[in-house]
Curated annotation (Swiss-Prot):
GO biological process: 'de novo' CTP biosynthetic process; pyrimidine nucleobase biosynthetic process
Name of this protein: CTP synthase
One GO molecular-function entry: glutaminase activity
Physiological role: Catalyzes the ATP-dependent amination of UTP to CTP with either L-glutamine or ammonia as the source of nitrogen. Regulates intracellular CTP levels through interactions with the four ribonucleotide triphosphates.
Subunit description: Homotetramer.
Keywords carried by this UniProt record: ATP-binding, Glutamine amidotransferase, Ligase, Magnesium, Metal-binding, Nucleotide-binding, Pyrimidine biosynthesis
Activity control note: Allosterically activated by GTP, when glutamine is the substrate; GTP has no effect on the reaction when ammonia is the substrate. The allosteric effector GTP functions by stabilizing the protein conformation that binds the tetrahedral intermediate(s) formed during glutamine hydrolysis. Inhibited by the product CTP, via allosteric rather than competitive inhibition.
UniProt source species: Synechococcus sp. (strain JA-3-3Ab) (Cyanobacteria bacterium Yellowstone A-Prime)
GO cellular component: cytosol
Length: 544
């Protein structure tokens, strides 16, 4: 039978529950325990797929096509385990299921209520993860902050869960904040006390407290928290601000988090093997070289909108002993100031995904600039579509070439709606989503980078390269290096006479791991390092 660890958060939002859950998952896995992680999100959206990136950040896509919270990206990267639609549940999905069952007559005339019907559905989703993934330990992160009205059904469900499965099979970990009042030079425990009091009023006594702090917690502060919160002092875990998220597992291991959790769950406290992770962190902090990569996007005001892109770049840097500095550039700013003012001194450029026409001209101008100057370039999803628009307008002679998404009246829709999307009415969950195969053409940059003839990548799009223009693009020097196995969909394009210019319709960033960087990002950083070693960027005019 699986054991369960419930991770809640208090005092403030964005306190780091997801990183704590992912780090604990890594620590348990390093002890040869299998782990699955579930994120419970208290918003009423069925999933985050239609939410603004400014409100939610990145939408992380799993192999099975689920549009999920960005924390699932942390879970995958830290535990090196694929998540699925089982691993993210929202209030909206819970209520949708409950209402469907009520309409079907499953409740046999009962008055449908939060308790027991909603809480039973929540508990069933938790059990389903254990049943279908069969891990030793299920970690459950409860989104939101203790005290939020939206989180109450989830907290009630996890309170009941210990009674359902037995006290020895459940541990409660509460992540809280111990702020430093700099004017007084004191660390204050009162916010933690009140947060635990709120949690206890619901009926949950935390077993472990993970205390976020700027400075080390003195023993006296730990003892005070222990006294007021009724938690053993050894279970008051210091989580001091770390230089990077990849330091956090090592910080929590030093504090004994995994050991305490295993004791509570009556599991063997096996010796961890963190040698690979320690080497990774050492490389992160002591790079031998540096590169600067520009990310030119629509949502750079909230960098979490491109979280997996940023992490994939860092992963590639780690493998090459190179530090990667990110320069965040709004594509709208490119429209205002021009690419020369913003990109002249970068070592490489990524144009990531997005939706809608805002900022598109800036993305296209960016791609033309890097194409003509030989700056290493990687386009992702919308980034590939903008590369196609640039080539159509500026090389292939297609005046006013555009995407049907941005200009339905364009005379040259080089990017068109997927045929299966033409009758779609709803936005949510209707994109081409999840893992699909891609056939790599031999003797191409993609073939060199992947080293395989068939690869599998995650998708999230509604528009695709228009095959009516495929011959024209090939004749004008474009190389289509990746296609769907039936040759219907263009998946990868590249320019062979450019030092490094490749773009994909899929999202390779979702499959990158710290210990296994994605080949396309690895290729970009390698090219950026080569570019940096040159006295100046190669000047190319109208090249591929």
């Amino acid at each position: 039978m699986a054991k369960f660890v419930f991770i809640t958060g208090g005092v403030v939002s964005s306190i780091g529950k997801g990183i704590v859950a992912a780090s604990l998952g890594r620590l348990l896995k390093s002890r040869n325990y299998t782990v699955s992680i579930l994120k419970l999100d208290p918003y009423i959206n069925v999933d985050p797929g239609t939410m603004s990136p400014y409100q939610h950040g990145e939408v992380f896509v799993t192999d099975d096509g689920a549009e999920t919270d960005l924390d699932l990206g942390h879970y995958e990267r830290f535990t090196d385990t694929n998540m699925s639609k089982l691993n993210n549940v929202t209030t909206g999905a819970i209520y949708q299921a409950v209402i469907y069952k009520e309409r079907r007559g499953d409740y046999q005339g009962s008055t449908v209520q939060v308790i027991p019907h909603v809480t039973q559905e929540i508990k069933e989703r938790i059990r389903r993860v254990a049943r279908e993934t069969n891990p030793d330990v299920v970690l459950v992160e409860v989104g939101g902050t203790v005290g939020d009205i939206e989180s109450l059904p989830f907290l009630e469900a996890i309170r009941q869960f210990r009674k359902d499965v037995g006290r020895a099979n459940v541990a409660y970990v509460h992540v809280t904040l111990v702020p430093l009042i700099k004017a007084a030079g004191e660390m204050k425990t009162k916010p933690t006390q009140h947060s635990v009091k709120e949690l206890r009023s619901i009926g949950i006594q935390p077993d472990v407290l993970v205390c976020r702090c700027e400075q080390p917690l003195p023993r006296s502060i730990k003892e005070k928290i222990s006294e007021f919160c009724d938690v053993p002092v050894e279970c008051v875990i210091q989580a001091q601000d770390a230089p990077s998220i990849y330091d956090v597992p090592l910080v929590l291991e030093q504090e004994g988090l995994a050991q305490r959790v295993l004791q509570i769950l009556n599991l063997e406290p096996q010796q961890p093997d963190l040698r690979e992770w320690e080497l990774l962190v050492q490389r992160l902090h002591h790079p031998q070289e540096q590169v600067e990569i520009a990310i030119v996007g629509k949502y750079v005001r909230l960098t979490d909108a491109y979280l997996s892109v940023a992490e994939a770049l860092r992963h590639a840097g780690l493998a090459l002993n190179a530090g990667v500095t990110l320069r965040w550039i709004s594509s709208e700013e490119v429209e205002e100031r021009g690419p020369e003012a913003l990109l002249a001194d970068v070592d490489g450029v990524v144009v990531p995904g997005g939706f809608g026409s805002r900022g598109i001209e800036g993305k296209v101008a960016t791609i033309r600039y890097v194409r003509e100057r030989g700056i290493p370039f990687l386009g992702l999803c919308l980034g590939m579509q903008c590369a196609v628009i640039d080539w159509g307008c500026n090389i292939a002679g297609l005046e006013r070439a555009n995407s049907y998404e941005f200009d339905p009246d364009t005379p040259h829709p080089v990017i068109s709606l997927l045929p299966e999307q033409k009758d779609v009415e709803h936005l949510g969950g209707t994109l081409r989503l999840g893992l699909y195969p891609c056939r790599i053409l031999p003797d191409t940059l993609a073939a060199k980078l992947y080293g395989e003839s068939i690869v599998y990548e995650r998708h999230r799009h509604r528009y695709e390269f228009n095959n009516a223009y495929r011959s024209l693009f090939l004749e004008s020097g474009y190389v289509i290096s990746g296609v769907s196995p039936d040759n219907r969909l263009v998946e990868i394009i590249e320019l062979p006479s450019h030092p490094f210019f490749i773009a994909t319709q899929f999202h390779p960033e979702f499959r990158s791991r710290p210990n296994r960087p994605h080949p396309l990002f690895l290729g970009l950083i390698e090219a950026a390092l080569r570019s940096r070693s040159r006295p100046q960027a190669l000047q190319l005019q109208n090249t591929g």
